[in-house]
């Protein structure tokens, strides 16, 4: 790790398990954690709340610059709690429609520029673990360790389906797989900060791995050993 405040980035597509892994690493190291995707989801939710269309870049830029968002780390194994304008929105931002809206506004240069410095401000001692789609390529290109976590579209849809069923929310597996494929296309083809692995990232396919197995495989990398 560098002498500067160290950063570990975990990038990857929706449903790859990057958020779970990043939180586990942050808890293990007792570092700060940033869910960058949640910032776009919160912005999408705020835009809907204030009647701002997803194709209004200037209005979204202003909203992003003044976004009243707060993250509170969850207990071990639990996701971070997210607050928008003082109200908890942890569940609301995880809905499929919010994720799809976030993917659309994330393609806007004005939005990404407005959130860039806010994301970098999370870099505080003793260190930061962050997950997203461009953490290792754009936000923290100098990160000490970059991980790109992926999984097959079907497996990612299956995981999402299981999550929704456990929450009592109805879902269709085939529709989820189509939505994930469409989101992948948008994320990979956008002109600004497309989803891709950094040249110096370690790529890990989690399709056939349990959460604990992914974590155990990554642990040695913290000391510079990718075995």
From Swiss-Prot:
It catalyses: CMP + ATP = CDP + ADP; dCMP + ATP = dCDP + ADP. InterPro entries: Cytidylate_kin, Cytidylate_kinase_dom, P-loop_NTPase. It is found in: Cytoplasm. GO terms for biological process: nucleobase-containing small molecule interconversion; pyrimidine nucleotide metabolic process. Disulfide bonds: none annotated. Keywords: ATP-binding, Cytoplasm, Kinase, Nucleotide-binding, Transferase. Its main location: cytoplasm. CDD domains: CMPK. One of its GO terms (cellular component) is cytosol. Belongs to the cytidylate kinase family. Type 1 subfamily. This is Cytidylate kinase. It comes from Nitrosococcus oceani (strain ATCC 19707 / BCRC 17464 / JCM 30415 / NCIMB 11848 / C-107). The gene is cmk.
